[in-house]
Amino acid sequence: VDSSQAATVVAHNSLGLTPIINHGTTEQKEKYLPKLTSGKHLWAFGLTEENAGSDARGTETTAVRDGDQWVINGTKRYITNASTSLTLGVTLQVMTKDSNGRSNLTTIFVENGTPGFESKRMLGKMMWRAADTSQLTFKDCQVPYSNLMGEEGQGIRYMLKALDGGRLSIAAMGLGLAQGAFEMALKHAKTRKQFGRSIGRNQVIGFKLADMSMKLELARNTLYRTCMLKDNGHPYAREAAMAKLYTSEIAREIADEAVQIFGGSGL
């Protein structure tokens, strides 16, 4: 089960579109959303760096205001959807300084093709090879000050909100992977015959399938409950993290058990 296509859609919807919908100005929404909701274009979310990711405050990419322009310098890595022919741009997390000299995360839109901005695909991945993953380089890249998303210095808040929704998307991917592996294993257990009967009639295989089904339903309930909290406007950050972790672990466990049921064919 390859999650490349799912990762492409998830990154665009939860990390590309959602911040613009939640925090963009009316002008920004009118400019970008019609194209980005058409199914013909993609948008990236530039957070991760060599020394920053989960520790977002370690961000080293900077933006300095120069009149009515931002001047951006730095490098981002492992950015999904940044180098495709469909990509229009990236929502970039950068460090800026306030009037007191304090550093804060700020969010800025940078369109593909902007001078000083280069996007390069990262090849040789072990997984998700069909999903675009890129390194972004900014060298004195200038964009209008109006490309600011929301308020200056509030990037950490916007980022965390986007990542909470992203965790639900990743959890859904894990659930789908687990469901697919279970269904394949169940079908194989019914059709593969050894010693005159299907292997699913052996208790050891039947017990494996029962455990897989139980874990699958628990993962589904965990994810759906968290989605219900989000849909009803309740806080869900803790539950989103739990759902992402749990469904990911269950996906690995069920996929591993499926390989065991397939035996040599699983390789």
Predicted regions and their residues:
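Short glycine/proline-enriched turns and hinge-like loops at secondary-structure junctions
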Residues: 55-57, 82-87, 101-104, 129-131, ...
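A short core secondary-structure module
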Residues: 73-118
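Flexible, small-/acidic-enriched active-site or ligand-binding loops
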Residues: 115-144
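A short, Trp-centered hydrophobic/proline-enriched beta-strand micro-motif
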Residues: 39-47
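Conserved hydrophobic/aromatic beta-strand scaffold that supports enzyme active sites
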Residues: 44, 60-62, 69, 89-93, ...
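Glycine-rich phosphate/pyrophosphate-binding beta-alpha loops
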Residues: 52, 77-84, 128, 165-169
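Internal helix-loop-helix
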Residues: 1-30, 34-40, 80-89, 100-101, ...
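Alpha-helical interface subdomain recognition
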Residues: 1, 8, 23-28, 35, ...
